[in-house]
């Protein structure tokens, strides 16, 4: 105490300054919440917030990419399990493929952060009810997207690779380039992430009253046809096998959405 007084520091004044800083911080937070509630943010404030959130999303992707590159050899090990050994045909091909894998993993790791900042940016324009609804929809969509990727990678992709490798013989041996193989894997699994959003989309449409269980039930045959058409459009190969691997889950997910609309939303 004597030392503090000798240095000219008043303990009471220090406590008062600390309390003022805490009060100003609380007031700042209260002002931000009030601006979110009444949507009174100016255009400059919106642009500043947009810039801040974009930077945070890019930082999240960059950090996720660093994590992905740190574990890139382990990731490549799991990616190559369906085919075994891969080759690179150019000196820089392996390096740039590793970078692509790291950035893709970084994007997946940062996806919840990106969705969160997108949701927070549009929050001032939403009512409290809409905020509660989006608070359920956004996490659900992220979970369904990852389930679709996992379903494709662990179940569909190995079967598809075995199917394509079955065309080899003694005169025709498979030789996979690491870059071409990763591009194939990427274009193969991504559509499943979006396809698995189908039950959520149907549920939202049913909740809004735009579709009902009767409407969904009457169009089952049309859905089967459209599932194969969409499977042909979004698959990287023109064969019926790959199209069926997308069309069948799409049809089953449509059935899940139908059951939700019929038995849950109706009640």
Functional labels for PLM-detected ranges:
Residues 1-267:
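Membrane topogenic/interface segments and analogous intrinsically disordered interaction regions
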């Amino acid at each position: 105490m004597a030392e503090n007084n000798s240095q000219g520091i008043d303990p009471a004044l220090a406590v008062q300054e600390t309390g003022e800083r805490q009060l100003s911080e609380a007031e700042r937070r209260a002002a931000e919440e009030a601006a979110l509630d009444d949507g009174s943010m100016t255009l400059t404030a919106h642009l500043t917030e947009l810039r801040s959130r974009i930077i945070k999303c890019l930082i999240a992707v960059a950090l996720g990419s660093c994590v992905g590159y740190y574990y890139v050899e382990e990731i490549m090990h799991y990616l190559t399990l369906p085919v075994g050994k891969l080759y690179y045909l150019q000196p820089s091909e392996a390096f740039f493929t590793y970078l692509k894998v790291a950035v893709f993993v970084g994007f997946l790791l940062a996806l919840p952060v990106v969705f969160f900042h997108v949701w927070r940016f549009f929050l001032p324009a939403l009512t409290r009810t809409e905020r509660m609804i989006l608070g359920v929809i956004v996490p659900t969509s992220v979970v369904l997207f990852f389930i679709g990727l996992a379903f494709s990678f662990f179940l569909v992709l190995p079967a598809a690779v075995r199917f394509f490798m079955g065309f080899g013989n003694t005169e025709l041996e498979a030789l996979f380039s690491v870059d071409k193989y990763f591009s194939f894997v990427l274009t193969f699994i991504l559509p499943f992430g979006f396809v698995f959003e189908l039950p959520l989309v149907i549920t939202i449409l049913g909740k809004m009253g735009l579709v009902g269980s009767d409407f969904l039930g009457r169009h089952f045959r049309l859905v089967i046809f459209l599932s194969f058409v969409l499977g042909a459009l979004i698959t990287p190969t023109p064969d019926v096998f790959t199209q069926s691997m997308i069309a069948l889950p799409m049809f089953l997910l449509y059935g899940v959405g139908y059951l939700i609309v019929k038995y849950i939303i109706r009640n």
